[in-house]
Amino acid sequence: MAFPPELTKDGYEIQFGTNHVGHALLLKFLLPLVVETATKLSSASEVRVVILSSIAHKFTVSSGIDFDTVKNKAERLSTFDRYGQSKFANAAYARELAKRYPQITIASVNPGAVKTGLQKTKAGGVLFRLYQAMFIPIIGVSPQEGARNQVWAATSKEAVSGEYYTPVGVAGNASAFAKSAEFGRKLWDWTEKELEGHRL
């Protein structure tokens, strides 16, 4: 989170490459087994994919994702815009994935402010560092508490495929742009093109 400008070894902006592209590639490799398992079970809700997003998905560039910045260091964007667009990709991709794989329950979740040390960074301005030092210790929850939303999405019969959940199991809080069918297709197409040629 809030990482300085850097690239993955595959040439993606570090946060986007780590939070979206890497996860999409792992999922590409796992999907055949996940789909096969879903077809063998009596209920699609028994097979789940939970994608970890963040409230930061709402704090991104005005276009949701600036695709011109995801294959370079994106130094013209703030570290929080870069993080936000990676988390935005998580929420939008989960929604699109759910449309394409209705036999699986797929949800994106915001774990909330969790005291993991993820926020301990030298990047960002004075206000963010003040937020880290003063508010996370007060409003943040333990990692065990922070895992509740993910566990809920992975197990609850009430989880709706394609939905974004805030703690715990609260739907309807995704940004309007993350719900855009047009943007979901655009992100899907971009991601599929990027993953071409990757094989196990």
Question: What are these model-predicted stretches?
Answer:
Residues 72-74, 125-135:
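A short C-terminal helix-loop "cap" of Rossmann-like NAD(P)-dependent dehydrogenase/epimerase domains
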Residues 94, 151-155, 192:
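C-lobe helix-loop cap of protein kinase catalytic domains
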